[in-house]
A protein has these predicted regions:
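Short intracellular "coupling" helices and adjacent cytoplasmic loop segments at the cytosolic face
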Residues: 212-224
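Alpha-helical transmembrane bundle of multi-pass membrane proteins
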Residues: 1-212, 234-594
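TPR/TPR-like alpha-solenoid helical repeat scaffolds
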Residues: 222-233
């Protein structure tokens, strides 16, 4: 694609822009992701407390996303990002030095507040500072750094997986490093030009826009772009003056269509199961039959690396295929991979290892009546004990029998007196018999490869499309006068459904089985594919001022291409700029407005 002169940008400056503005998300996931395994083990939390500690971050992120729109509109995108970085640092350090579960809980709640602010402010900041031809790529880079954070977090978890005492402290403490870096470096970036224009600070806005454009760009081209931005802001201000309430926003069909599409994108992203896959990847891998916990952690790092690598494929495709085609093709692949993932778990359940031995023939407990491993681990009070070593010859008769076949096993009651993963009696009663394996949540399976293949394919298809596109499209489709509010609303939907899916995953696996849960996610993804085929417009190669007029059409016609959308093609930039007393002598060498 040829570059328009007005869209030419200093690659080094924009590189600094997105590196500094998205490093936060590496931090975000580093604190959210696998350290929870080890920190929860350290504090020996009850099941209820575990759910609270895991979910409180998402809950506070959801709540803070409601106020993020007001704060970014009132105080600016830059200041909110700086505040989020500072708060994130405090939360990370609190978790690292936590000596009670309540301090850990408070630290995760504080981090959630920062995440909610940043997840709204950062994409909007990038979209408002970037030129048209690479806006989608830069906003998508934001999501790429989320996947980078997941990858780094998985590597860190693997490195510290053998340290069950203090390893989790290092994982959580390291999360403060990227937020400190962002707090320092982001200080030197200017505020969003569009926000400055909206506040009437035209000189500072022109300086900021100049700093985001290539040093040799013809000044007239920058002035033309600035005039387009200014006229859009003036129109938005008039709309704002006539639309002081949420009722006015709701009564605006164009805004409501855009908000519907934006929120739907966020909802489908979550109900397609992405954060279930990422939060519980190591657990899913264990549930597929991988027995060693350390191996499961490293395999989860492999899945995170696939997510990270292929998210960068989206950077290439977003400006070539466009947002619409990339989203639809990504969802189609997600549906196929979810079917494979669900089928793998279903085959594993159908062929679940039998309960071959009962060490206490007179025992008539619930556990003794279980017929296979799947029934056993589905119970809240039982676990499955089997041999990892297939060699016989052990002096213990039952152990010898178990060792003749990896898929022989016995169902035993859990030990209610301890949080340690041992049975209450008989085999697996303690950790001294290293040949015996004890599981309360998964079963050994010969179909592990199928589940892992589905998991890898899921990330292969999700990462380039449904990962970044909801954030990219939401940063583009709202008019300036309501952008902060609408983006805040769509972000709130994202975090709410993130929380809902994460909280219900284990419940769904109990009610529907794990493969039933993934079939349900497949159904949601299919519904999303159908809806987006009709409701999702293409925003590629359109300015933010042009995009809002896409939604003049009814929802069912949004997928159709339209031409000549812009009301700004014939803007007399010289008149518009000079009327607002913008100093024409301002050049790219102007000092930075922090």
């Amino acid at each position: 694609m040829g570059l328009q002169t007005v869209n030419v940008i200093d690659n080094e400056k924009m590189k600094q822009l997105y590196q500094r503005s998205v490093v936060f998300f590496s931090d975000m996931i580093l604190a959210l992701f696998p350290a929870q395994w080890f920190s929860l083990d350290y504090f020996h939390l009850s099941t209820t407390m575990q759910e609270i500690v895991i979910s409180v971050t998402i809950l506070t992120a959801w709540l803070s996303s409601f106020v993020a729109g007001y704060l970014t509109n009132k105080f600016g995108r830059k200041l909110v990002i700086l505040i989020a970085s500072f708060v994130f640092t405090i939360g990370g350090l609190m978790m690292a030095f936590a000596h009670t579960e309540y301090v850990l809980l408070a630290g995760r709640a504080i981090i959630g507040f920062a995440i909610g602010l940043a997840s709204m402010a950062i994409p909007v900041y990038i979209a408002e500072a970037a030129p048209v031809h690479i806006r989608g790529k830069l906003v998508s880079t934001n999501v790429c750094f989320i996947t980078f954070g997941q990858f780094v977090a998985s590597i860190v978890a693997g490195l510290f997986s053998n340290d069950h005492i203090n390893g989790w402290r290092w994982m959580l403490g390291l999360s403060a490093v990227p937020s400190i870096l962002q707090l320092i470096f982001f200080t030197f970036l200017p505020e969003s030009p569009r926000w400055l224009v909206q506040k009437g600070r035209y000189d500072l806005a022109y300086q900021a826009l100049t700093k985001f454009r290539y040093a040799n760009t013809v000044e007239e081209d920058i002035r033309t772009e600035f005039a387009s931005i200014k006229e859009s802001c003036l129109n938005s201000e008039r709309d704002r003056n006539n639309s002081k309430s949420i009722k006015a926003i709701v009564s605006n069909p164009m805004v409501m269509r855009a908000l519907f599409v934006g929120c739907l994108l966020m909802i489908i992203q979550q109900v397609a199961g992405i954060n279930t896959v990422m939060y519980y990847s190591a657990t899913i891998i264990q549930m597929s039959g991988v027995t060693d916990k350390s191996t499961a952690v490293w395999l989860s790092a492999l899945t995170a690396s696939i997510n990270f690598i292929f998210s960068f494929v989206g950077l290439v495709l977003v400006e070539r295929l466009g947002r619409r085609r990339l989203t639809l093709s990504s969802l189609f692949g997600v549906i196929i991979s979810l079917l494979i993932l669900a089928a793998g778990f279903q085959l594993a359940e159908i062929n679940s290892p039998p309960v071959s031995f009962n060490p206490n023939p007179n025992d008539d407990s619930i556990c003794s009546r279980m017929r296979n491993c799947d029934q056993c681990v589905s119970s809240l009070i039982c676990g499955y004990c089997f041999s990892e070593n297939t060699k016989s010859g052990n002096k213990d008769l039952f152990v010898s029998l178990l060792q003749t076949n990896k898929f022989n096993g016995t169902c035993l009651p859990k030990n209610p007196a301890t949080q340690l993963p041992f049975a209450n009696s008989s085999f697996c009663v303690n950790g001294t018999r290293h040949s015996m394996m004890w599981t309360e949540s998964w079963c050994p399976s010969q179909y592990s490869w199928m589940t892992l293949a589905g998991l890898m394919l899921y990330l292969f298809f999700f990462a380039p499309g449904m990962g970044p596109m909801p954030w990219t499209i939401n940063s583009e489709i709202y008019p300036l006068w309501t952008r902060s509010f609408c983006y805040s609303m769509s972000t709130s939907f994202n975090w709410f459904f993130n929380l809902l899916v994460s909280l219900t995953f284990l419940t769904l696996t109990n009610l529907l089985t794990i493969y039933g849960a993934f079939y349900l996610y497949t159904f949601f993804a299919l519904i999303g594919l159908i809806l987006f085929y009709f409701f999702l417009p293409e925003t590629k190669d359109k300015s933010l001022e042009e995009i809002e007029f896409l939604f003049e059409q009814p929802l069912c016609q949004l997928h159709k291409k339209r031409q000549n959308l812009s009301r700004f093609h014939n803007v007399d930039s010289t008149v518009n700029v000079s009327n607002e007393n913008v100093n024409p002598s301002i050049t790219t060498s102007s000092t930075n407005d922090s």
